[in-house]
């Protein structure tokens, strides 16, 4: 059995409290000037499957999340960034105040950024960017995508 359902069902007040904690923690950091808000959510998906030959089954999947988006301003330059935590189980979420403080840290790190000169440089991707790149690559090398011609590898079929 998959362990993808958390019976914990937070109410609106506890979600509002979690969102407020994330936002307050971010706003408490020097240099953070504004907030686009803290957010907290919970969801449950019920999946039911039935076939014409008599098979039927179902399962539930839950999700919990908390995030904060904040703004910093220095010398007329404004930057915005965020942090979030999501988990199947509420107890696995990062603390709301840690999410808020990390959102503030990420936002402040963007202040004073400048473009690098042209050249060859080693690249380190942020975990959020890396996950997106891996997902895009996985979709491109999927056999069905290649066969449908929707992959950038479509013209490479049969080549080494």
Regions found by a protein language model. Give the residues of each.
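Active-site bordering "gate/hinge" segments
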Residues: 1-160
């Amino acid at each position: 059995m998959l362990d993808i359902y958390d019976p914990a069902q937070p109410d609106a007040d506890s979600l509002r409290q979690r969102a407020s904690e994330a936002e307050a923690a971010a706003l408490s950091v020097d240099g953070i000037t504004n907030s686009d808000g803290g957010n907290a959510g919970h969801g449950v998906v019920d999946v039911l499957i039935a076939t014409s030959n008599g098979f039927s089954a179902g399962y539930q999947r839950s999700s919990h999340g908390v995030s904060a988006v904040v703004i910093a301003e220095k010398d007329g330059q404004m930057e915005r960034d965020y942090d979030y935590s999501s988990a199947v189980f509420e107890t696995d979420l990062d603390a709301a105040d840690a999410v808020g403080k990390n959102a503030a840290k990420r936002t402040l790190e963007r202040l004073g950024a400048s473009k690098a000169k042209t050249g060859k440089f080693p690249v380190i991707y942020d975990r959020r960017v890396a996950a997106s790149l891996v997902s895009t690559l996985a979709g491109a090398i999927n056999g069905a995508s290649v066969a449908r011609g929707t992959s950038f590898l479509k013209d490479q079929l049969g080549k080494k």
